[in-house]
Regions:
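Hydrophobic alpha-helical segments and their boundary regions
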Residues: 13-21, 459, 515
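Bacterial N-terminal signal peptides
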Residues: 19-32
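Feature marking well-ordered beta-strand scaffolds used for ligand recognition
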Residues: 35-534
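Intrinsically disordered, low-complexity repeat segments enriched in small/polar residues
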Residues: 10-13, 28, 34, 38
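N-terminal secretory signal peptides that target proteins for export/translocation
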Residues: 1-16
Length: 534
């Protein structure tokens, strides 16, 4: 039997039945907030608290609304899927097992054995519900995030509520995995938690070394909280620094005089003010862990973090959202810098634009030339055959171009009448969470040697989620061409489409390739597995 996890804050822990009861209560309490969010203005990462019923999405052989070179192979329903991370383990008999760690909104994280991608099986998890509940994993350490929908307390974390009653449920829980080599399943135990009010943990990223955690709060604190994990196995996780935007430094509650942490104001490379540019949403690291790439909503930062645990974070460069004429009416400019990952060879930085925050930008599903959030490519080193990149470097990024999916005609969604009954019936279609070939969870290569999790795609290919437009695979090796039989969007100036799949009910949060399969968290469908056949 796999373990649902137990809460070590209370003697004897929580039984599975008690945990499920807490989950049901938390989801019931969270529902009004999700509905309220559906009617609010643009925000990043929309919340949907109710998945489609299992009988609607788990039918074997259900045809896609549209697909080329990407085939649907499996579904786990009944959860609101978000981010996915991968790793592998070896059982007692010497067989390698592959695992998907799936974040959920309102249901805690789940672990699935995907050694046979067509037949995922439960292998563990932890019922500690809350929003957004993105997941990170490095070896035996797992992190889950809580930030509410609009800052409200929607977390069922007993640790946060017991240790930090004034934190309003905002922060992260940190767990230890115990792998049973005989059963090839996991027991999950709570190690500790870290509160970071008032903004909470929208995302969190483990550093490649495992020595620290970056908690990203884009939408309230405008900060990255640096959490010291050097003694985490002893239950110690210490908030050391808050890397904060200048405009938030003196805001109430952000850098209080009695705080245990030290605030560090982020600046431009020359030390001048970068006020209102630093809204960290997601981070990625170089292979050696010395450089951090920060998708900061209003811009994208490249930062030297080799001495971050001593309070030093030096800005190397800032990539502006507006790099071409026309402002935000020009899709080649970025509205929301959402994710910024470096290619496995360190030469190309890929930045995603989550236009409309995933909520309001639906024109790309309603009209052929509607605005959509795309992928933007910047050279950080010379790219053979592209002479304008001769002087490219981390301190001098050079724009290569942008990619927009060709928005193929899809069949009418047979599940639309059921989707219309949910709190937010309209699905956005902007790009969301992606994985580059040759990369693991947080950087090029594995986050920890021996646990794999690295995409097998070539280093100029990627898989990505597109919310209501499903799962896509593309090459970013060069300029677009339609000679392969796929007509590219006329606005694309870099990259080529390799395939896609839009399943009924798709509202896909993340799509990450591993060993030939693409694993996708989906807010309506749950957890999906695809196979790229190109």
């Amino acid at each position: 039997m796999f373990s649902l996890g137990r809460n070590t804050e209370k003697e004897g822990g929580l039984s599975a039945r008690a945990s499920l009861l807490m989950l049901a209560i938390a989801m019931a309490l969270a529902t009004p907030f999700a509905i309220a969010e559906a009617t609010s203005g643009d925000r990043t990462d929309p919340v949907r608290n109710v998945p489609l019923a299992c009988e609607l999405v788990s039918t074997p052989g259900m045809p896609a609304r549209a697909n080329v070179n990407v085939v649907h192979t499996a579904n786990v329903c009944g959860i609101v899927g978000t981010d996915v991370e991968l790793q592998s383990r070896t059982d007692l008999g010497g067989r390698v097992h592959d695992y998907a760690f799936v974040g959920t909104m309102g249901g805690g994280f789940r672990i699935f054995d995907v050694t046979d991608p067509a037949h995922p099986s439960h292998a563990g998890g932890y019922i500690d519900s809350g929003w957004e509940n993105d997941v990170q994993v490095r070896g035996d350490i797992v992190v889950a995030t809580f930030d509410g929908v609009a800052g409200e307390d929607s977390s069922a974390s007993t640790c946060l509520k017991t240790r930090y009653p004034e934190a309003n449920g905002q922060g992260v829980d940190i767990y230890r995995l115990d792998y049973n080599e005989l059963t090839a399943t996991f027991e999950t135990n709570l190690l500790t938690c870290v509160a970071n009010p008032p903004g909470g943990a929208h995302n969190a990223t483990l550093h490649t070394s495992g020595q620290w955690l970056a908690i990203e709060d884009c939408c309230s604190d405008w900060a990255i909280d640096v959490i010291d994990l050097r003694n985490v196995l002893q239950g110690q996780a210490v908030h050391r620094y808050r890397l904060i935007d200048a405009s938030r430094r003196d805001s109430a509650g952000r850098c209080p005089a009695d705080a245990a942490f030290t605030c560090v104001v982020m600046t431009r490379p020359d030390g001048s003010s970068a006020s209102s540019l630093w809204q960290p949403h997601d981070v990625h690291f170089s292979r050696d862990g010395r450089t951090m790439y920060v998708a900061a909503i209003q811009s994208t930062f490249i930062v030297d973090v080799r001495n971050v645990l001593a309070g030093q974070a030096r800005t190397i460069s800032i990539i502006p959202n507006i790099s071409e004429p026309g402002g935000l009416d020009n899709p080649h400019n970025i509205s929301i810098s959402h994710q910024a990952d470096i290619s496995s060879d360190g030469r190309i930085l890929v930045i995603s634009d989550e236009r409309g925050g995933g909520l309001s930008e639906t024109r790309c599903l309603e009209q052929p030339n509607g605005l959509m959030g795309g992928l933007h490519f910047w050279a950080l080193a010379r790219i053979p055959g592209v002479p304008e990149t001769q002087g490219a470097s981390p301190s001098n990024p050079v724009k290569l171009g942008s990619y927009f999916n060709p928005n193929p005609n899809s069949a009418i969604d047979p599940l639309q009448e059921f989707i219309d009954l949910l709190p937010r019936a309209e699905r956005g279609c902007t790009v969301h969470v992606f994985r580059l070939g040759g990369n693991g969870s947080v950087s090029p290569g594995p986050i920890l040697t021996g646990y794999d999790g690295v995409s097998r795609m070539p280093n100029r290919e990627l898989s990505t989620a597109y919310y209501g437009a499903g799962v896509w695979v593309l090459s970013f090796a060069g300029r677009p061409s339609s000679t392969d039989g796929i007509a590219e969007d006329s606005r694309t100036t870099w990259g080529n489409t390799l395939g896609w799949n839009v399943m009924p009910g798709a509202d896909t949060w993340s799509a990450k390739e591993y060993k030939g399969a693409i694993y996708a968290g989906d807010m309506l469908r749950g957890f999906d597995v695809y196979r790229y056949t190109g």
